[in-house]
Amino acid sequence: MISIVTPVYNEDGNVVYFHDEVTKVMQTLDMDYEIIYVNDGSKDRTDELIHQLAAGDPHVRALTFARNFGHQIAITCGMDFAVGDAVITMDGDMQHPPALIPKLIQKWQEGYDIVQTKRTATEDAGPIKKLTSAGYYAVINSISNSPVVPGGSDFRLMDRKALDAFLRFREHSRFIRGIVGGLGFKQCTIEFEAPARHAGVSKFSMKKMLHFAMDGIITNSTLPLRVAFYLGVLAAVAGILLILHVLYCVMMDEAVPGWATMTILIAIFGSLNLMGLGIIGEYLGRMFEETRNRPLYWLSDDTAAHLDNPYRVSHKKV
């Protein structure tokens, strides 16, 4: 069986069309399948639509979060419930083309445990987004021990044994591309051109993108902490040089630099201190979240009504 996991957030203009396209593709394959939709706290008719799909198609299971938990947690939730021998994760806005599913399955049947995808082009991505994306992946791959496919996406196939290994990672601040890259197993990458969204606009705001980028760096590397240390060393060296310069001026009976220089240096050193504290705070904040050991998510509804997940809560309690 193939499990297809699709997180949806305010996608009432896409989800039915997406479902029809995925169903057409899966019906051409001689394989049993399930489609799991995870509603990540949508405010539109998305929840109503996925419940209608579940009522009319026995292959569909609709899971509804009690509130918004985020894209990465929604993917993880769908994986928790998936029962397939392989699981395909993909977005429901048609930028992950369903036509590529047979190729993912083919690579899996050839013996690959994880089949990644890489966007070679995105129709609705501007030059600034492309440049910042390329720079981000260059940075994260230079500082992380877990390789991340440049231009990669969360459109991938994972074999059951790779999925079971992935599901042992339960951190709240998660960057799935980094986790999957560090799993090992036999992996390959398929390139594709991402079409424009079928309808609507991206729900991935600038704030969410920055948070996603920060999670990718902090959860995959401790280099920012070392950078803060190195900057502190440089600041200390600069301070020593300034002291030597002042002593030289005193010995040579020259005028000691005035308040402007001192004010600038104090501002610089103060900024470095605050930056270092901010970096440490990011790590400590994430550590605090993990030590509370709260569930990754909880559900308000599950159309399969199976009590097979510890995070499910009754609809009345939400």
Which residues does each PLM region occupy?
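Short beta-strand/loop segment that forms part of the nucleotide-sugar
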Residues: M31-G41, L63-T64
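Short aromatic/hydrophobic "clamp" motif used to bind/position activated sugar donors
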Residues: V87
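Acidic helix N-cap motif at the loop->helix transition within catalytic regions
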Residues: N14-Y17, D44-L53
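Cell-envelope/extracellular polymer assembly enzymes that use nucleotide-activated donors
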Residues: M1-S3, E34
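A conserved acidic beta->alpha catalytic loop
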Residues: N39-D47, M94-Q95
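Short, well-formed alpha-helical segments that are part of the catalytic scaffolds
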Residues: E11-M26
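Hydrophobic helical membrane-anchoring modules
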Residues: F175-V318
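Acceptor/aglycone-binding surface of glycosyltransferases and processive sugar-polymer synthases
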Residues: Q52, H59-R67, H71-F81, P98-I179, ...
